[in-house]
Amino acid sequence: MKAAPHGDRFLWIADEEGRRNIWVAEKTGSAWAVHRVTNDDADDGIEIGDISWTPDGQQIVYVRGGDFEFPERPSPNPDLLPQGVEQDIYIVSAHGGDTRKLAAGREPEVSPDGGTVAYIDDDQIWTLDLRDAAAKPAQLFHGRGRPDSLTWSPDGKYLAFASGRGDHGFIGVFSFANQTLSYVDPSTEIDREPVWSPDSRHIAFVRIPPDTSGVSFKPRRSAPPWSIRIADVTTGEGHEIWRAHDGPGSVFHGTESEQQLYWTAGDHIVFPWEGTGWLHLYTVSTSGGTATDLTPGDFEVDYVAFSGDRRTLVYSSNQDDIDRRHLWQVAADGGAPHELTHGDGLEVIPVLAPDGTLAVLRADAHWPLRPAIVESDGQMRDMTPQMMPKDFPADKLVTPKQVIFSAADGMQIHGQLFLPAGDADGKHPAVVFFHGGSRRQMLLGFHYMEYYSNAYAMNEYLTSLGYVVLSVNYRSGIGYGLDFREALNYGAAGASEFNDVEGAGLYLRSRSDVDGAHIGVWGGSYGGYLTALALARASDLFAAGVDLHGVHDWNLELQNWGPYNPNADPNAARIAWESSPLASVKTWKSPVLLIQGDDDRNVQFSNTVRLAAALRAQGTPFEEHVFPDEIHDFLLHRDWITAYTLGSEFFNRYLKGVPASQ
């Protein structure tokens, strides 16, 4: 969701059963008029993203096609379109109408005067003159590395970007007046997150020492500290204005927002830091000195909006309501924050218009994510009530309850418990859900990420079928502080999350309303990993499972996330193997349904191939469903429907004894 540069207008992308389109809301009097800008009417698996307004607010630039998580990979084509799918940049009037293709590429950024768009294609930066419909793309320069974070200077004379070089990275600056490229303050570390000073003379950026261990999915509570630097654009000289302490917060961890640094009107830099063990916003003078915590307390900041006058920050956090999100506001240069919203809903992604109008993407236990206006009294007014399907069963959904249970090792774990409505007596089959990530937190309502909004809907559906459902926020997830996220021995370093898996099953078994002999487990990605681990190590506790694109061999999966050689550290490779479901496959007895797309870029499809082969060899009952050319986060709406239909039918057969035909 983004605000127009002028007036009260906001845009966002809506996905209606696979039909992805851009919508605009504009204030007319005291009401909001909403219209669709683009007209894609097919569930074709083609995503749109990288949306932005032109500076005059009259047009919208966006990208259609490609993989926005792995932009360097070929465009996925799960709909098996014979012509294939390309990633292209388009422009369209904010009032709707015909779209115009500008060029092949991604990450378009329009210059402050609206005359030029810069973008990335094939790891090079290109520009196109927007004032001339016949103009051809021109490569700005020939550069090494992988560019991203294109950022125009406020005066439009420079373009800054981050240049990833593997184990190091630079901040590049192109001067349009001189037609020269330079890299400011280069080092052997990784420079990223560039932000301009208001006068276009300096750039602030983050400098991060590289992690040379080469192993992902392991705890990392400390490292050589990261820092914030400011460089002079003319000379290229830079200096440090702040450095993290040793220990907690020495590893850089950003918010969910696209931008991490904010240059304020008072010449301060606002930035995220975990110095207290919780992700907060801090401010430090551009001349250096001690940083001030703007958001003190035991909670985490999620998304951040920065006012056009550079004086105010609005952010979402779980302050005073750890399993929800609400909005808070604080002065950019310091002062006490104050609460803007509260209640039983989830107010997650704030957006500020130039005149101070505050919009937010919000959800709750009964309605999924939707745009709303936040009034001065904290009340919220939905912009698009007419967009909700008339047959949406909001009144039939239950409100999950917050529960806290003990893991097998005693750690306290949060979850959301879904209880069948109007059926308090008797014992029910139950299902445990594990989210993916693992850097995620499930909430007491529809999630703000589409993948987990779908999962929340699945949990509600299973509840409507008579299941007690427990969604688990296991260790190594977010929301509960640094030490919880960087849990000791998690993932490939020891699978300590299995304590939470076992604790969840035992918690359900102890409930008087649960049939302890019929507890199932399901999840996707990292949740698929924990589902497989549950079945491999505890088939006596979990009677059946649905595993969507799960990790089954860490030594295979780690190769997907960077250079990894299992032979380089045999002891670490041994622990990674022992932390894998395949290492315990001999004790896997319960039936499982395996689901994955074979163009998965997050979890190698070989994980499922190897697990299926092992289960087949030992006679463990399993079923499978493969989506050819589908990726990790299914792009086709009908693939989600198929996966969840098969999953619910599988549980009905093995946990309720319902024949397949029913």
Walk through the language-model features, giving the residues of each.
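Signature of short aromatic-glycine-proline-rich micro-motifs recurring in repeat-based ectodomains
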Residues: M1, I48-S52, G254-D267
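Conserved beta-strand position repeated across blades of beta-propeller domains
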Residues: K2-A4, S52, E109, T151, ...
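A flexible loop/linker signature enriched in serine peptidases of the S9 family
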Residues: I13-W23, D40-E47, V63-Y90, D98-E107, ...
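Serine-hydrolase catalytic core recognition
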Residues: G266, E339, V348-Q662
